[in-house]
Amino acid sequence: MADNIQRGEEFEKKAEKKISGWGLFGSKYEDAADFYDKAANCFKLAKSWDRAGSTYVKLSTVIQSSDSKHEAAQAYADAGHCYKKTSAKEAISCLEQAAYLFLDNGRFNMAGKYYKEIAELYELEQNFEQAIIYFEKAADIYQSEEATTAANQCNAKVAQFAAQLEQYQKAIQIYEDIGRPSLNNNLLKYGVKGHLLNAGICQLCKGDVVAITNALDRYQEMDPTFSGTREYKLLVDLAAAVDEEDVVKFTDAVKEFDSMTQLDAWKTTLLLRVKEAIKAKELEEDDLT
């Protein structure tokens, strides 16, 4: 490990010497880039991630001097991947630069990939507001490139975090927008009932019984097969429980569905919010009597 660090430092010195020395403009930067690349690889082998990351940043700067945007972008991406192991902030900064350079070079799918990586880092940091911003950026790029599946995955993440932040209408709109065109795609249509279930749960969180009923009617029109699914039955039963302010009925409906198809943490969290809202209404009415 120490040997690799020493070798890395030697390559780094050679790179700096090339840049500051005499030589043809193009060739000296190419040689320096080669030395920085070797130095970064040595630091990676030594698991010295910060040094590897900073060396890749130097590599990108040198490459940009020779106007090779694709390679410069890739060097920033490599820096970001090294920094992922030590500093989310530095990783995000480098991946942002990579995405910018790929966009500038017309490599839109690559830019989308790195915006998505940034969003995932913010997700790990529990910074859902920023995660939404970067998943939206990635989704927009994928949509423009007609990469529908990738765009849907990013938009679903936006909806997930929007709902967690109680931005229910935004989440509903996204889930419905994903579900509608997916009905005409043989690969995507089987996921529609899941998107409609998620949208319906968000409707329940808003607590507007009329809106919930209207949404269920709309989902049946959108997908005539939906009314025959367990997801639809769950939403109908939950809507009735909300309307009747019946916590027991609500709990039983959730338990029945969960016994066949386990609810994930996101759905469980939102359904608990609805349940607590019903309980709060019951307490209000008890106080009034």
From Swiss-Prot:
Pfam families: SNAP. Required for vesicular transport between the endoplasmic reticulum and the Golgi apparatus. This is Alpha-soluble NSF attachment protein. One of its GO terms (cellular component) is membrane. It is found in: Membrane. It is a peripheral membrane protein. Belongs to the SNAP family.
